[in-house]
Amino acid sequence: MKKVVTLLVVFITLQTLVSGQIMKKTQPSNQTTKSTVSTNDLVSTREMDRINWMEFREVVPSKIQTVLLPTGTLEPHGVINNGADNTAPTAMAQQIARRTNAMIAPTLPYGITGSMADYPGAFQITEAAYRPFVKQILEGLAKNGFRNIIILNGHGGGQTAVLQSVAAEVSAEKKVRTLVINWWSLASDETKEVFGEDGGHAGNNETGYIQAIDPSLVHPERYKDDMATAYPAAGTWSAVPFPSSIGLYQKGQGYPKFDQKKADEYFKKVNDKVANLIIDVVRKWDLAGL
C-alpha cells in the first residue's frame, strides 16, 4: 500500500512539473493581461472600463490627470491579425500606463481604413461618421477630469490627419492638452536599430511588435515575400485596393523577420520611446504653465 501511495505521489508531482513546463513554453513572453492590476498602484486597475465609478472619482483628477486612448481599425496585415492596429496600441497602453501615471480609455477599434478596405474582414468608417464620434469621445474624457489626452494611434493614412485636427479642436474648446502619437513613425530609429533596415505596414516592425505581444497572432507558415509591395513614390502610381497586404516603406527593406528575440527587444524599445515622449511633453506643458 505504501508503494502504491508513493508511486501515486511521484506521478502527480511529475505531471505537475510537466504541465508547468508546457505552460511556460506556450505562454507568450509579453502577453498582455486582461486587466492592468497592481497591488502597489494608485488604483486597482488602470483601465477605465474595469474600474468602479467611486474609485475613479477618488483618483481623477486629484491623482491622475492623463488618459491614453488607443485608436486603430480592422484591415489586412500580411500574416498577422486584422486587428493589429488595435492590438498594438492597446498593449502599449497597458505597458506604459503606470509609468506615465495614466488611465486607459477603451480602444476605438474601427477607423478610416482607406486603400485596404476591400480586403476580407476589413472595415471602413467614413470621415463624416468618424470625426464627430472621436470628438465626442475626447470631449467626454475632458468632462471626466482628464487634463492630458494622449491618443495612441495604431493606424495611419487619412485617420492620422483627422485625429490631429479633432484633438486640436478639443484642446482649444475644452482647455485640455492633447497629443497624438503614431508609434511606428516615432520609433523609426528603433526599427532600423533592431532590424537593421526600415519597416512597413505589416513589415518587420509591426509584425515584430505583434509577435512580442502574442506569437499566436503571427503565421509565418503563410508568408511569402511576394505578399509585399513597396509604397510608390509620390506622383508615380496609385492603386485601389492596394495590391498587397504588406506595404514596405522602402523597396527591398522591411520584410517580416519572425525573430522572437528581436521582436521582444523591439517591443521594449518602442514602449520606452513612447512613454518617454509622453512624460517629457507633459513635463514641458507643466513647466510652461499651459
Predicted segments with their positions:
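Positively charged n-region of N-terminal signal peptides that target proteins for export
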Residues: 1-4
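Extended, histidine- and acidic-residue-enriched regions that form the cofactor-binding/catalytic faces
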Residues: 22-102, 106-114, 120-128, 132-150, ...
